[in-house]
């Protein structure tokens, strides 16, 4: 296709992927499947992210620190699925040459393209930062003592982290207009927004891999170290099935004039004893989670790097990389809620039929969970 380096630049800076086909009529028929994919992702992502936000805001038990970061990511993904994807789907279905806004938007749609790019950049940046905050929260939950965790994740600190994610994303988006190519100007040799996007994705991937693989390593090396957290949702985290069965019983209340003393650990039923297959399944779950992030983000990293250095990138590769990255916004709620018992109970109370089907599907791979009385609710179980 003609002028492939400039088109790849437009894609990386957040412009419409579908509008890249305007320069060549032969691509017109290939925009329809991409538009249909965007439509499906927009509908599914809007419903899924909206449902998670509604459940967390409606049910007290779901209002935990970790879920606050999940909701933050769902809000960002909702803006992408409900506001940006429908525009891409509609613009891709328009005839070639008519997919630009009226002439009062810079005569060639430059302002409208920049607006859509800013909306996409804001949503994706906050979403990726939220993934990092969730991973870091879970990693510190495993590797730090309960008192340290409580100090780090006080209410004001959590609110500050959420606000910082939006402020940082907004600051990065505001850098786009000065770097946007001027109409009629020759494309630059180095496209800094593309390189910035690639660097951000690489940093996010490194942090996620460090946190989740660190969780698996810490649990396998020292289950006793993890058990002191006494966190009632710990067994639902990737790689933590072995730790769930090692939780001590809650300490006895102090008697008159006496000090509190820990209860003698009671033997667990045979059904709750950790099995090698269950530990292997939990290790596999964290690897699958990491693979999802790698599959969704790494193609866009290489496309962004190539675009940053003005290397030609085929339109199909650009389309696939963006669709994979956008699919992460639609699948974000499922990554964190499909094995969470509290979420499943909340869904069953709202949508009985759907909740029962989801519970049956998750039960096939779920690790046996311990009761709340056995696991306790200290540290990370604190509510907002």
UniProtKB/Swiss-Prot annotation:
* UniProt note: phenotype after gene disruption: Mice have increased locomotion, increased motor stereotypical behavior, and impaired motor skill learning. Mutant mice also show facilitated hippocampal-mediated behaviors and decreased anxiety. Chronic blockade of delta opioid receptors and mu opioid, but not other Gi/o coupled receptors, using delta opioid receptor antagonist partially improved motor coordination and normalized spatial navigation and anxiety of mutant mice.
Q: What are the GO MF terms of this UniProt record?
A: beta2-adrenergic receptor activity; cytoskeletal motor activity; G protein-coupled receptor activity; transmembrane signaling receptor activity
The free-text tissue note of the record is: Expressed predominantly in the striatum.
Q: Which UniProt keywords apply?
A: Cell membrane, Cell projection, Cytoplasm, G-protein coupled receptor, Glycoprotein, Membrane, Nucleus, Receptor, Transducer, Transmembrane, Transmembrane helix
Looking up InterPro entries in the UniProt record yields: GPCR_opsins, GPCR_Rhodpsn, GPCR_Rhodpsn_7TM
* Superkingdom as given in the UniProt entry: Eukaryota
Q: Which residues lie on this side of the membrane: Cytoplasmic?
A: 57-73, 137-158, 217-285, 332-384
One Pfam family from the record: 7tm_1
What subcellular locations does the record give?
Cell membrane; Cell projection, Cilium membrane; Cytoplasm; Nucleus
Task: Provide the transmembrane region boundaries.
Answer: 36-56, 74-94, 117-136, 159-179, 196-216, 286-306, 311-331
Q: Which residues are on the Extracellular side of the membrane?
A: 1-35, 95-116, 180-195, 307-310
Q: Which GO terms describe its biological process?
A: adenylate cyclase-modulating G protein-coupled receptor signaling pathway; G protein-coupled receptor signaling pathway; locomotory behavior; motor learning; neuromuscular process controlling balance; neuronal action potential
Point out the glycosylated residues in this chain.
3
What is the topology of this protein in the membrane according to its UniProt annotation?
Multi-pass membrane protein
Supply one GO CC term from the record. cytoplasm
Spell out the family assignment given in the record's similarity comment.
Answer: Belongs to the G-protein coupled receptor 1 family.
Report the PANTHER family cross-referenced here.
OPSIN
Function description: Orphan G protein-coupled receptor implicated in a large repertoire of behavioral responses that engage motor activities, spatial learning, and emotional processing. May play a role in the regulation of cognitive and motor function. Couples with the heterotrimeric G protein complex of the G(i) subfamily, consisting of GNAI1, GNB1 and GNG2, thereby acting through a G(i)-mediated pathway. Plays a role in the attenuation of D1 dopamine receptor (D1R)-mediated cAMP response in ciliated cells. In on-ciliated cells, involved in the inhibition of the beta-2 adrenergic receptor (B2AR) response.
Query: What's the protein here called?
Result: G protein-coupled receptor 88
Organism expressing this protein natively: Mus musculus (Mouse)
